[in-house]
Amino acid sequence: MRSYERSKAAYAEAVKLMPGGVNSPVRAFKAVKMDPIFMARGKGSKIYDIDGNEYIDYVLSWGPLILGHANDQVVEALKRVAETGTSFGAPTLIENELAKLVMERMPSIEIIRMVSSGTEATMSALRLARGYTGRNKIVKFEGCYHGHGDSLLIKAGSGVATLGLPDSPGVPETVAQHTITVPYNDLQSVRYAFEKFGEDIAAVIVEPVAGNMGVVPPEPGFLQGLRDVTNEYGALLIFDEVMTGFRVDYYSGQGYYGVTPDLTCLGKVIGGGLPVGAYGGRADIMEKIAPSGPIYQAGTLSGNPMAMTAGYETLRQLTPETYEAFKKKANRLAEGLSEAAKAYHIPHTINQAGSMIGMFFTNERVTNYETAKTSNLDLFARYYQEMANEGIFLPPSQFEGMFLSTAHTDEDIEKTIEAARRAFAKMSDCL
């Protein structure tokens, strides 16, 4: 067994300083029945806690670190920028360069606005959609998490699902009444919502791959069906690609599935590990944003040169071949985990989209939030604990996915599979 004494002491202090001892709820490790593990440093595919334990990391800061920790080119670029000034409150050339790089790989984005978080991106995109259409209501999907904006905390995923919270207190009924929530992968329910409220629906917002109820890919035809119904009723289609953007494919989720949204929200990978978000889309819509239009949105640190540099240096290193390599490694990891689970009769379902993998402790096919919730959470907690002791760092929630980086080696994958075999062997006694 590994020692976590320094982490335990750090957490005991943290709970006196911050709500629940953390600055984002899922980091509290409540779902895995452990105290949080405090990290000290990372390099490549490895991460090291303050007790000196080493892990192969599949959290990667919840997805942004697609090149692994402390990538040499990103770090060197950040050093250069830090020496010339970390923020100016004025435009810089690197904003143009990152914008062009994003738009080259995401043709649906004709104009882009940089912000400082994924939440800021989705909140701003919804305000824009309402302002552009003159309508009030939005459609979202059960278990999909789009940040902590009031309109979006209705039947949300991520930490909301992890902690088993109902709709968040503090969201006024007058706000909640404009959010229509339907099951993910259920086009019939979407059509029913439009038949009933279509004249007042401004937008449908969706993750191309639902990443905050585990990893749940879209069923064939689902995303195209959303495109069709929004076109029919004059509503906007917003892809929340904060997680899937430049993660599932070189051309992101919209390129991978061949469906073009009106607006796209980005984050995570485009910041290379620094706080970044962005939203963009059709020029006729984006031109409504101030100062070119009347819909207001602003930010002190939007376009921050440090964050823009980290994003630019990250995207610059990603090629179509990168994603082919990801696919092979992710396939091997998913197959290996499944084989290990079968060997010890562990109920499981594995979903995969590019370099995102979700493992559920249920034999039921997971296609939406209801089926995701059939996973045995006690088994997941035991699995997490055993894998942590084996030196494998996983997201401490059943409702979050694993991520791969370019730094993960074939050896890392095989070590992870062998660790899972040992973990499942120990877990088989509680079935």
Swiss-Prot record:
Pfam family, one: Aminotran_3
Classification via Gene3D superfamilies: Aspartate Aminotransferase, domain 1, Type I PLP-dependent aspartate aminotransferase-like (Major domain)
Places the protein is found: Cytoplasm
Modified residue annotations for N6-(pyridoxal phosphate)lysine: K268
Needed cofactors: pyridoxal 5'-phosphate
Record EC number: 5.4.3.8
Record keywords: Cytoplasm, Isomerase, Porphyrin biosynthesis, Pyridoxal phosphate
Keyword presence, Cytoplasm: yes
GO molecular function: glutamate-1-semialdehyde 2,1-aminomutase activity; pyridoxal phosphate binding; transaminase activity
Chief localization: cytoplasm
Top class in the EC scheme: isomerase
GO process terms (BP): protoporphyrinogen IX biosynthetic process
One GO location term (cellular component): cytoplasm
Record has Manganese as a keyword: no
Coiled-coil regions listed in the entry: none
Chemical reaction(s) catalysed: (S)-4-amino-5-oxopentanoate = 5-aminolevulinate
Subunit details: Homodimer.
Protein name, UniProt field: Glutamate-1-semialdehyde 2,1-aminomutase 2
Gene giving rise to this polypeptide: hemL2
